[in-house]
Amino acid sequence: LSEAHALMVATHCHYHPELQEKIIFAEGIGGELMENMEPTPISNQRFDELLTEIDNLPIENKVPSINSSLPNPLAEYLDGSLDQIKWRLMGPGLYQKKLWKGQNGLKLWLLKARKGTKIPIHDHKGLEMTLVLKGSYHVEDRHYTTGMIEIAEPGLKNHQPKIDKVEDCICLVVTEAPIYLHSFIGRLMQPLIGL
């Protein structure tokens, strides 16, 4: 998994303990399979090189903020809470925080949308996964609340999430390709926004 997908899965599992149990079970099976594999011979030189590489790995001692309302994987990744984020304006009622950029247009970012905001109509060239961290939104007759993921498949047309009017909504988003905004102004702004 990419860094973006791994964080999405870990954050989603925080909201669903039954998924955490399945992952622990699958990791146990993986461990059993590795234990039963035939060992591969390795030269002393390569073994020493591997140990040196391990010794040279950076040590990260990130401790999430005690006051963080975020799931632990995301709090550790952000090294804090949502209150510390410097949001960047995307458009009326919409803000983003870019977190990670991979190859071929893969991006991990946070979206903050004011209550009652309509996301501009757009099409998807690649997969998009949106995990609700706070608040809620709906797309047609589907409603997404905290801990739920919406998966927008490549080729999805006329996608327009609408933020519920109760409170602002914050989401963790993975996009695998740029979106196509329908509005002319949106397309003009898209290079500046970076989506």
Q: Predicted segments — roles?
A:
Residues 3-7, 11-17, 21-83:
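Positively biased amphipathic helices and basic secretion/translocation or surface-docking motifs
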Residues 94-97, 101-124, 152-157:
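Conserved short histidine dyad/triad with adjacent acidic residue
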Residues 68-102, 106-108:
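Charged, low-complexity intrinsically disordered boundary/linker segments
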Residues 123-125, 142-144, 163-165:
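Short glycine/proline-enriched turns and hinge-like loops at secondary-structure junctions
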Residues 114-117, 124-139:
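Glycine- and acidic-residue-biased ligand/ion/polar-headgroup-sensing regions
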Residues 156-181:
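Ligand-binding loop in jelly-roll beta-barrel domains
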Residues 139-160:
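Short acidic-glycine-tyrosine-enriched beta hairpin
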Residues 177-195:
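Amphipathic alpha-helical interface segments
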